[in-house]
Amino acid sequence: MQKKIKVLCVDDSALIRSLMTEIINSQPDMEVCATAPDPLVARELIKQHNPDVLTLDVEMPRMDGLDFLEKLMRLRPMPVVMVSSLTERGSEITLRALELGAVDFVTKPRVGIRDGMLEYAEKLADKVRAASRARVRQNPQPHAAAAAAAHGQTAAAAPLINNPLVSTEKLIIVGASTGGTEAIREVLTPLPPDAPAVLIAQHMPPGFTRSFAQRLNGLCRISVKEAEHGERVLPGHAYIAPGHAHLLLARSGANYIAHLSDDPPVNRHRPSVDVLFRSAAQHAGKNALGVILTGMGRDGAAGLLEMKKAGAYTFAQDEASCVVFGMPREAIAMGGVDDVAPLSDMSRRIMARLASMGDRVQRV
C-alpha cells in the first residue's frame, strides 16, 4: 500500500483549518497529520509528525507566515504551499514567500460558497502532490542576484548579459507553472535592456500577475508589465499573461500585438502555456525562441512542439534545477526540445542563440 502524503495545515482560522482538512482527507493519497493555529504551535508539530508538506497561512498572530517560512527554510527546509488572500497585499506577501523558498501557493477557500469548491479541491490536491515531489531550495537568497541585476552589477548566480542586440522581430516565449515565479525572475534579470520582447504565461490566479509583473519590473533591466489587449509588443519589454486570460501573439502588419482571450481554460489553465506557444508558432515561426520552465502537468509540451515544427528554437529547463520536472519532461518526451539547460545558464544560452541567428539579430 502506498504511503500517504502527510500534510500539516497552519492557519489561524479554525474554519479554514477544518475545510482544508476535509479537502485533503477526501483524497486517497494524502492526509492531514495535524493542524496548527500559528507558527509557534506548528514548530512543535513538525518535530512530532515530520510532515511531507506544510500548508501555511500568510498572515497569522504571534509570528507571521513570512518570518516563520524564512526560519523554516534556513533550519529545516521542507515543501511549503502558501495559502493567501486575493488582495494586493496578499499577492505581494505571497510572491515574497516564493522568493524565500515556498514551492507554490493557493488562494484561501471561500467559506460557505459551494460553487467552485470541487475545482478548488482538485487544485489544492494537485499542488500538495506536486509539493511532495518538489525539490526544495536550500537557503534561497534571491535578492542579491536580483538587486545586482537591477543595478547593472555582475552576480555569480546570474551573470548579466551585456551583448547589445538590435532586433525588431525576435521574440522569447516563456511558459511555467509550479516554481515558475522564481525561474522566470532568474531568466529575466540578466537580460540586457534591448533584448527582444518576452511573452510569458505563468499559471497564476487573477490579482497576482499584476503584483508579479511590478515586482519583476523593479528587479530587471528590461521593462516588465502585465499584458494588455491590443498593445504593441516591443523589444526591451516582457509581457505577463493576466491571471484571468489567455495571452496570444497576433500580428498587425509588421508589428506583433498582444491579444487577450477569455476562452475556456486549456489543460485546466487560463492562462495556458499551450495557447501562447501555439499562437507564437502561427505568427512568429522561426523568429521566436520557446522556453518551457519548471511546472507540474503537461501544459505547453504540445505547443512547444508546434513552435519547433514552425522553425523556432526551443529550450527546456533541466530536471536538476526544476522545482517540479513535469512540463519540461513532457516537452522533451514529445520531441519538442532542442536544448535542455540548467536554469542558471538559460539566459546566456537564449541570448547566444539569438546572436547566432545571422542578419535577424545583429551585435552593435
UniProtKB/Swiss-Prot annotation:
Keywords: Chemotaxis, Cytoplasm, Hydrolase, Phosphoprotein. InterPro entries: CheB-like, CheB_C, CheY-like_superfamily, Sig_transdc_resp-reg_Me-estase, Sig_transdc_resp-reg_receiver. Phosphorylated by CheA. Phosphorylation of the N-terminal regulatory domain activates the methylesterase activity. Its EC number is 3.1.1.61, 3.5.1.44. PROSITE patterns: CHEB, RESPONSE_REGULATORY. GO terms for cellular component: cytoplasm. Residues 6-123 form the Response regulatory domain. It comes from the Bacteria. Pfam families: CheB_methylest (PF01339), Response_reg (PF00072). The modification 4-aspartylphosphate is found at residue 57. Contains a C-terminal catalytic domain, and an N-terminal region which modulates catalytic activity. Belongs to the CheB family. This is Protein-glutamate methylesterase/protein-glutamine glutaminase 1. It comes from Burkholderia thailandensis (strain ATCC 700388 / DSM 13276 / CCUG 48851 / CIP 106301 / E264). The gene is cheB1.
